[in-house]
């Protein structure tokens, strides 16, 4: 197989987005558009990926990192000019180069693979990905000869009235023989209505040289959607959400209301899990088998075990075990690890805490910067007092300990194995194992106190 290369065009400013955020960094289902494009392209076993950057270059580099090399297009002088900036990386290489727009987040590796196969089968020097649009206004048109071969591609602004009637459009995705591309691109001129160097002109030059030019028509116009404004962004979001949700349902996940369920492209969900409306799964969220998630639950970059129930709660950058019950209205903050068969109840906040198997915090508690052992019971209103205004300190609660209601554990402090803390205590010193800690004022009852104050 020939070497494969890809060039992502991501240098446009995107003024129609009316945003301070660089266009290709606008997220679709929680993931920047350009990263959708890069991840799909990388599935094609590329020898090299080059992203053309301009406005917001550093932000794009930060987002894609080591996935790509980068070439700067300092002035936006057209698509051919943009591709030309990749010449230092690709000039002289033998193989096939795919050119993709960074604002086409719905384009799949499967479609690009089909285009590459068409390119190879036809022995073409260039192949364009086309689609049929009900309303082709604004798109370049594919002009074919009588025998059906691609004759040229005409930009909308340069098209004649007759050419504008054509509904087969240029999607802006191409593949080229790499050596032919960088030879011919030097011949492209800017003699057109926009005064720009158009990449489709490479097709016409190759055609004039007698080279074979092919076209692969995808049957899915939605997949080729280019995002240029917030309306198109919302359409891309809708189409991507439908695609993601359909894939999970086909893999054995029940979505009670797919229209109101939001799942990241990179999320993984096990079979027989049920997702209720209002659930948002972000980033690298991973859900096990037979879970119940939602309604109104947000899980981000977290791993959830099997048979776990999470209702009306938030889990962020944490790990949750099997057979756990969380919520309603619980918050698992970053760097927490929740064991198996745990209960985290209503209005409980866990932060940077190791929470052992079968332990419980059922109501109205804050457990932060703590190590909680197995079989621990934290009563209603249990608080780890972890911050002195300058520094956070660790609280250790060992296996089998029992913390009574409305107790404050002032860190750094350790409650030993099997120890009890009496309700209402403020514990400032370590509690030995099997001991009872009582740290509260002794109750005093003053007889007839109320009667006497009313006499005054």
UniProtKB/Swiss-Prot annotation:
Enzymatic class: transferase
E.C. number(s) listed in UniProt: 2.7.7.23, 2.3.1.157
Binding site for acetyl-CoA: 386-387, 423, 440
GO molecular function, one term: UDP-N-acetylglucosamine diphosphorylase activity
Pathway of action: Nucleotide-sugar biosynthesis; UDP-N-acetyl-alpha-D-glucosamine biosynthesis; N-acetyl-alpha-D-glucosamine 1-phosphate from alpha-D-glucosamine 6-phosphate (route II): step 2/2; Nucleotide-sugar biosynthesis; UDP-N-acetyl-alpha-D-glucosamine biosynthesis; UDP-N-acetyl-alpha-D-glucosamine from N-acetyl-alpha-D-glucosamine 1-phosphate: step 1/1; Bacterial outer membrane biogenesis; LPS lipid A biosynthesis
Binding, UDP-N-acetyl-alpha-D-glucosamine: 9-12, 23, 73, 78-79, 140, 155, 170, 228, 333, 351, 366, 377
GO cellular component: cytoplasm; membrane
Active site, UniProt feature: 363
Function, as annotated: Catalyzes the last two sequential reactions in the de novo biosynthetic pathway for UDP-N-acetylglucosamine (UDP-GlcNAc). The C-terminal domain catalyzes the transfer of acetyl group from acetyl coenzyme A to glucosamine-1-phosphate (GlcN-1-P) to produce N-acetylglucosamine-1-phosphate (GlcNAc-1-P), which is converted into UDP-GlcNAc by the transfer of uridine 5-monophosphate (from uridine 5-triphosphate), a reaction catalyzed by the N-terminal domain.
Family named by the database record: In the N-terminal section; belongs to the N-acetylglucosamine-1-phosphate uridyltransferase family. In the C-terminal section; belongs to the transferase hexapeptide repeat family.
Subunit structure: Homotrimer.
Listed name of the protein: Bifunctional protein GlmU
Species classification: Bacteria, Bacillati, Bacillota, Bacilli, Bacillales
């Amino acid at each position: 197989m020939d070497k494969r290369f890809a060039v992502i065009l991501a240098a446009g400013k995107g003024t129609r987005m009316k945003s301070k955020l660089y266009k290709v960094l606008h997220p679709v289902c929680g993931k920047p558009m350009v990263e959708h494009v890069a991840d799909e392209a990388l599935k094609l076993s590329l020898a090299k990926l080059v992203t053309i950057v301009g406005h917001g270059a550093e932000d794009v580099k930060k987002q894609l990192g080591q996935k790509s090399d980068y070439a700067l297009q300092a002035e936006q002088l057209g698509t051919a000019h943009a591709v030309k900036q990749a010449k230092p990386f690709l000039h002289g290489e033998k193989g096939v180069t795919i050119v993709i727009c960074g604002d086409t987040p719905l384009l799949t590796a499967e479609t690009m693979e089909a285009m590459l196969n068409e390119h190879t089968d036809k022995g073409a020097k260039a192949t364009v990905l086309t689609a049929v649009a009900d309303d082709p206004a604004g798109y370049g048109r594919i002009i074919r000869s009588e025998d059906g071969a691609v004759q040229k591609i005409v930009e909308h602004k340069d098209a004649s009235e007759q050419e504008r009637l054509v509904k087969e459009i240029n999607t802006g995705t191409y593949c080229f023989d790499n050596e032919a591309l960088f030879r011919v691109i030097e011949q492209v001129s800017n003699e057109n209505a926009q005064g720009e160097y158009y990449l489709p002109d490479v097709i016409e030059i190759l055609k004039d040289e007698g080279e074979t030019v092919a076209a692969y028509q995808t049957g899915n116009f939605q997949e080729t959607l280019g995002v240029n404004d917030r309306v198109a962004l919302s359409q891309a979001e809708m189409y991507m959400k439908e695609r993601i949700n359909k894939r999970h349902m086909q893999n054995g996940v029940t979505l009670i209301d797919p229209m109101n369920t939001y799942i990241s492209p990179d999320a993984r969900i096990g079979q027989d899990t049920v997702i209720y409306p209002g659930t948002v799964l972000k980033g690298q969220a991973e859900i096990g088998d037979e879970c119940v998630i939602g309604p109104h639950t947000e899980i981000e970059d977290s791993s959830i075990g099997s048979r776990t129930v999470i209702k009306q709660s938030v889990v962020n950058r944490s790990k949750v075990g099997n057979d756990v019950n969380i919520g309603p209205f619980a918050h698992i903050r970053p760097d927490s690890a929740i064991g198996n068969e745990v209960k985290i109840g209503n209005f409980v906040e866990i932060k940077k805490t190791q929470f052992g198997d079968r332990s419980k915090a059922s109501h109205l508690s804050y457990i932060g910067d703590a190590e909680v052992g197995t079989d621990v019971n934290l009563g209603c209103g249990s608080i780890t007092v972890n911050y002195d205004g300058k520094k956070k300190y660790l609280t250790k609660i060992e296996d089998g300990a029992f913390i009574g209601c409305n107790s404050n554990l002032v860190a750094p402090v350790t409650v030993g194995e099997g120890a009890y803390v009496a309700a209402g205590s403020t514990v400032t010193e370590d509690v030995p194992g099997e001991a009872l800690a009582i740290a509260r004022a002794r109750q005093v009852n003053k007889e007839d106190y109320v009667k006497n104050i009313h006499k005054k």
